[in-house]
């Protein structure tokens, strides 16, 4: 499988947020402001690629020792450690982004999209490089979904044209569903 096919497939066709419905919590929670959405997306890309770089070889070691059943626990521990590293780096080098992300930054630890991409790389039997490309593409797809949705929310949040019964969470969920449907149009691309 070519790297371009993997990238296009995971960004547009099998987008973790819009097609596989993983990572919904930060998708809905951090998409109110564009700068926070971009910051979260970049942090997720970074964590996904680092998590894949660490978990892929560790899974090979787990398989050698016949303890592959520990995969999920080990992956969660690795992801948690990486998120702590990212949080410390952001706090030191980009404090404004650290403050903007707030409670959602530690939630990357429990972002099922990060764990999902690590497990998918193993399940799909990707090589190490294919796994890195897939995780990068998954992060870019997450960022793309966040940026598009953030732009949509800027138009609908506090919009007086939205009926009272739909204001707040209902219109946000309807908008997310419509965005997901729009991405289904890429289904035959790859």
Language model regions located:
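Structural signature of hydrophobic alpha-helical transmembrane segments
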Residues: 3-18, 66-81, 133-145
